[in-house]
Curated annotation (Swiss-Prot):
It is found in: Plastid, Chloroplast thylakoid membrane. 2 of the reaction center chlorophylls (ChlD1 and ChlD2) are entirely coordinated by water. PSII is composed of 1 copy each of membrane proteins PsbA, PsbB, PsbC, PsbD, PsbE, PsbF, PsbH, PsbI, PsbJ, PsbK, PsbL, PsbM, PsbT, PsbX, PsbY, PsbZ, Psb30/Ycf12, at least 3 peripheral proteins of the oxygen-evolving complex and a large number of cofactors. It forms dimeric complexes. Keywords: Acetylation, Chlorophyll, Chloroplast, Chromophore, Electron transport, Iron, Magnesium, Membrane, Metal-binding, Oxidoreductase, Phosphoprotein, Photosynthesis, Photosystem II, Plastid, Thylakoid, Transmembrane, Transmembrane helix, Transport. One of its GO terms (cellular component) is chloroplast thylakoid membrane. InterPro entries: D1/D2, Photo_II_D1/D2_sf, Photo_RC_L/M, Photo_RC_L/M_CS, PSII_PsbD/D2. It catalyses: 2 a plastoquinone + 4 hnu + 2 H2O = 2 a plastoquinol + O2. Photosystem II (PSII) is a light-driven water:plastoquinone oxidoreductase that uses light energy to abstract electrons from H(2)O, generating O(2) and a proton gradient subsequently used for ATP formation. It consists of a core antenna complex that captures photons, and an electron transfer chain that converts photonic excitation into a charge separation. The D1/D2 (PsbA/PsbD) reaction center heterodimer binds P680, the primary electron donor of PSII as well as several subsequent electron acceptors. D2 is needed for assembly of a stable PSII complex. GO terms for molecular function: chlorophyll binding; electron transporter, transferring electrons within the cyclic electron transport pathway of photosynthesis activity; iron ion binding; oxygen evolving activity. This is Photosystem II D2 protein. The modification Phosphothreonine is found at residue 2.
């Protein structure tokens, strides 16, 4: 029996090889296979956002002005969510709602679903871009893995949360003031600040900022003076074999400050990766819980005692009253189509309100 070893010869003009060669060619801006997803989706998402904030009103969906054309500025303009009556419709331009009419599509809030979906796929494309480039230059894929944190937060807040509610209407609109309003909504209707997943998210993000500041300052403090350049950036050769700063000195310094310190660069930098990414993922999990209307911590005993004893009040009971006030005001303001009217006797009252 004869065994032939070797590769099966391919056709000279193989389409896949031709595309692979062009897409992954070394150029100023790398394209890659991931670019087929990233660049079109990012272009449409940003283009839709700029179009919406410049020209498109929210009068038909929220009863608001939301564009530069109507007098808004960068902080108050937004691409707002579709009307509550449209539920979870994808609002395709050629769908039954707009029927190919671009103006009507914009009035109904079609730009929001357009920006949200293209934005989500653009973020996924950017993550794949990091995987692809890491594989090309033989790096580990931790950059891409880290970027899963922001993707998880975006998908949970803009897509999963409104899918768990009655419609896209309850997602955040794409604008600065609109996001602030959404944060107030989360607090009033879900008591988000007392949610343990939010607490873990805050600990992760602020802890990462602290770690970043400490790490940057420590490296600057322990740089070796082995260059004669005028500043840090010109004093070192990017191909030098020696380390740029003294890990031993840094370890000794923080050992004296705290009693403990990182003694290993790998563990130090993995910890700096782990803290923010875990925080973002915990926040995303918490928002998925809110989509299902899971509650935060409830200290019912304090609420009962506060109701029975006018002299007893805690920061928790004050916040619960404040949340009731947010709901009573925001529900009527935010959902005018419901024609909500709250009589005086149901509005929250407290010792300090």
């Amino acid at each position: 029996m004869t065994i032939a070893l070797g590769r099966v010869p391919k056709e000279e003009n193989d389409l896949f090889d031709t595309m692979d060669d062009w897409l992954r060619r070394d150029r100023f801006v790398f394209v890659g296979w991931s670019g087929l997803l990233l660049f079109p989706c990012a272009y449409f998402a940003l283009g839709g956002w700029f179009t919406g904030t410049t020209f498109v009103t929210s009068w038909y969906t929220h009863g608001l002005a939301s564009s530069y054309l109507e007098g808004c500025n960068f902080l108050t303009a937004a691409v707002s969510t579709p009307a509550n009556s449209l539920a979870h419709s994808l609002l395709l331009l050629w769908g039954p709602e707009a029927q190919g009419d671009f103006t009507r599509w914009c009035q109904l809030g079609g730009l929001w679903t357009f920006v949200a979906l293209h934005g989500a796929f653009a973020l996924i494309g950017f993550m794949l871009r990091q995987f692809e480039l890491a594989r090309s230059v033989q790096l580990r894929p931790y950059n891409a893995i880290s970027f899963s944190g922001p993707i998880a937060v975006f998908v949970s807040v803009f897509l999963i949360y409104p899918l768990g509610q009655s419609g896209w209407f309850f997602a955040p609109s794409f604008g600065v003031a609109a996001i602030f309003r959404f944060i107030l909504f989360f607090q009033g209707f879900h008591n988000w600040t007392l949610n343990p997943f939010h607490m873990m998210g805050v600990a992760g993000v602020l802890g990462a900022a602290l770690l970043c500041a400490i790490h940057g300052a420590t490296v600057e403090n322990t740089l070796f003076e082995d260059g004669d350049g005028a500043n840090t950036f010109r004093a070192f050769n990017p191909t030098q074999a020696e380390e740029t700063y003294s890990m031993v000195t840094a370890n000794r310094f923080w050992s004296q400050i705290f009693g403990v310190a990182f003694s290993n660069k790998r563990w130090l930098h993995f910890f700096m990766l782990f803290v923010p990414v875990t925080g973002l993922w915990m926040s995303a999990i918490g928002v998925v819980g809110l989509a299902l209307n899971l509650r935060a911590y409830d200290f019912v005993s304090q609420e009962i005692r506060a109701a029975e004893d006018p002299e007893f009040e805690t920061f928790y009971t004050k916040n619960i009253l404040l949340n009731e006030g947010i709901r009573a005001w925001m529900a009527a303001q935010d959902q005018p189509h419901e024609n909500l009217i709250f009589p005086e006797e149901v509005l929250p009252r407290g010792n300090a309100l």
